[in-house]
Amino acid sequence: KQIEGVRTFHGMAALPDFLAASRFLVCLLPLTGDTRDILNRDTLGRLMPGGHVINVARGGHLVDDDLLALLDSGHLAGATLDVFRTEPLPVEHPFWRHPRITVTPHTSARTLRDETIAQIAGKILAMERGEAVAGVVDPSKGY
């Protein structure tokens, strides 16, 4: 895709060039077989020196030891992490103590009780009537 005045990248073949031109990397990917462990030493090591990674997607994207090594080597300046392989993040995990890692609480929104009850009840009634239900996850897509 071409956008005037914007450098665009597409597909895995363009990923190395994209990373080399990036100071910040924000992961918003679904967790699939193709994206598991995508935030690894090779991928993160291609970011510009002094880069920063932000993961608000899924903990399975990040290889913890690779991130720690790149932070400790000075290649990466920092990381902001909202999701982890094990949640809640164990108290003894090094992410809590690392000076270049910011851990944020994984809460995107507060659940509103009355609205949630109405939504669930509405979906049950739609299913009983044989109607399509919105928001159904398709496991064949991997997310």
Kindly give the residue locations of the regions a language model identified.
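Rossmann-like adenosine-cofactor binding region
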Residues: 1-94
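C-terminal helix-to-coil terminal segments
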Residues: 87-143
